[in-house]
């Protein structure tokens, strides 16, 4: 047939059997990729330290999605909390991965069967004997089945009625675990950070899908609407399907980047806005002040801060710090976190507390500035020592650590003070192991960043695909050069311009 590569889908345009076949093969590839990718990630995943080396620091992509649906156990004898377990069963990382690969194989065989046995009686219109699909009825079937699945997920899986529930955590990503979720039917269900909205929206959307599916199965479209929306053309189905997919891709890119109940920070890492707004810094300060008000010392107050919370308050975990051309997990950048050194408190020689100005998200380098409680610069690390008035040496800055591994330790040596001032720019101070993975010190993005970037790119691509195929199906007659309202018989080949009597070809 000699079709160019971008026209090869033409072969399934009027071939329902092979149209089913290629869709089965596509689903087989998707399912096979998911299972294989899960096995690969499990092979390289280190579950030993869920606090300082969580899955999102290791660049895991499918494991967070499996975990948020309630899978927490592995055949390797561990669970997501780092504990040892026995008898994980089929509802485990490897069990679900294996079922996807088995499903992929079955779909592969089904695809081959439908490719070979493409000319089934089922696909022929009994009135004409030609291949035909009842697209409005197929639409009703798909809508009904997807509505049933949507309702089942919300009513049974998420609520724990028949299933584990989903991953639920607090706003600061400390107490996350899999638990049943009650549907939220009030206005609070529209809060994107309320897990109850996930249950109620799936139940509501599922019921709507079931009813709409039944409607389309029982009611035939009016002929004028059928013609106007090109309901008989398979390319109409393609166009509207692409529209649904690109819209979904745009939505999930937003919920991932800005955060939501469906994208918990324990599984995907923090959002960039939590760094920009000082979200974790403020919570830590609030907890410290509460401890001090309760009679605790500074050391006791900072020691009570969970290491997990302190680790979130570190710029290296900001997904916007990684570049799009820096491949690999976060651990390949700054290294594997080994421990929290503690909270660094800086003071000048007169005993006034100084605060290091934190680095904004979109800076690679930033001047080291130490400010007093009024925001006035009192010390810095100057670029030109000769013109310096506020150097660490001149101001006599010292640093004392509270909490962490260096609890109670004070450094007065200017070189050491400057080292920790530079590191305090990046948030709480942590020690990293850069040798194990040969980490290069250049920040990487988290799976949150990669998911957002990938889905935005595909959404844009699919948006243009929707416009392209929509235009092709709506203006098919125009592109073909045939006017649908043409009354007279057109003799093909009689005119230089199709259907234009003024351009009749002259006999040679």
Swiss-Prot record:
One of its GO terms (biological process) is photosynthetic electron transport in photosystem II. It comes from the Eukaryota. GO terms for cellular component: chloroplast thylakoid membrane; photosystem II. The keyword Transmembrane helix applies. It is found in: Plastid, Chloroplast thylakoid membrane. Keywords: Chlorophyll, Chloroplast, Chromophore, Membrane, Photosynthesis, Photosystem II, Plastid, Thylakoid, Transmembrane, Transmembrane helix. InterPro entries: PS_antenna-like, PS_II_antenna-like_sf, PSII_PsbB. The chain crosses the membrane at residues 21-36, 101-115, 140-156, 203-218, 237-252, 457-472. The keyword Nuclease does not apply. Binds multiple chlorophylls. PSII binds additional chlorophylls, carotenoids and specific lipids. One of its GO terms (molecular function) is chlorophyll binding. Signal peptide: none annotated. Pfam families: PSII. It is a multi-pass membrane protein. One of the components of the core complex of photosystem II (PSII). It binds chlorophyll and helps catalyze the primary light-induced photochemical processes of PSII. PSII is a light-driven water:plastoquinone oxidoreductase, using light energy to abstract electrons from H(2)O, generating O(2) and a proton gradient subsequently used for ATP formation. HAMAP family: PSII_PsbB_CP47 (MF_01495). PSII is composed of 1 copy each of membrane proteins PsbA, PsbB, PsbC, PsbD, PsbE, PsbF, PsbH, PsbI, PsbJ, PsbK, PsbL, PsbM, PsbT, PsbX, PsbY, PsbZ, Psb30/Ycf12, at least 3 peripheral proteins of the oxygen-evolving complex and a large number of cofactors. It forms dimeric complexes. Belongs to the PsbB/PsbC family. PsbB subfamily. This is Photosystem II CP47 reaction center protein.
